[in-house]
Regions:
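A generic alpha-helix surface/boundary motif
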Residues: 4, 26-27, 85-87
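Generic N-terminal amphipathic, Lys/Arg-enriched alpha-helix
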Residues: 1-15
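Divalent metal-dependent catalytic cores for phosphoryl transfer on phosphate-bearing substrates
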Residues: 8-12, 35-108
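N-terminal glycine-rich anion-binding loops that anchor highly charged ligand groups
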Residues: 21-22
Length: 108
């Protein structure tokens, strides 16, 4: 998945307010990547996808984690406010073709 595809994907999954937040997070992630010598595209991709599961319900997030327990890393035992990142990383790997472990870790 490239940055354009990620941007289109999250646009379709998020409310206007959350989408604007996500674009601002991407800008900050790129600034931080530049400052610390990290790959800017990877930082931007992770930032774009992190909140991609933020607006789905708890039951759907639970189902995603249960369908992929090997990727959920005990997600259900974690506080529910962090479930969206775990689920976003699972979806990125299983449905959206993201394979880079650093990106997936940053999404989660």
């Amino acid at each position: 998945m490239n940055l354009k595809q990620a941007k289109e994907l999250v646009r379709g999954r998020l409310s206007d307010k959350r989408y604007e937040h996500t674009l601002n997070v991407r800008k900050m992630a790129v600034k931080l990547a530049k400052r610390y010598g990290v790959d800017e595209d990877k930082a931007a991709l992770a930032a774009l996808l992190h909140d991609s599961a933020k607006e789905i319900g708890k039951d759907e997030m639970r189902a995603i984690m249960r369908a992929h327990p090997e990727l959920a890393e005990g997600g259900e035992e974690r506080p529910t406010p962090v479930w969206h990142g775990i689920c976003a990383a699972i979806l990125a790997r299983t449905e959206w073709g993201v394979e880079d472990e650093a990106v997936l870790s940053a999404i989660a």
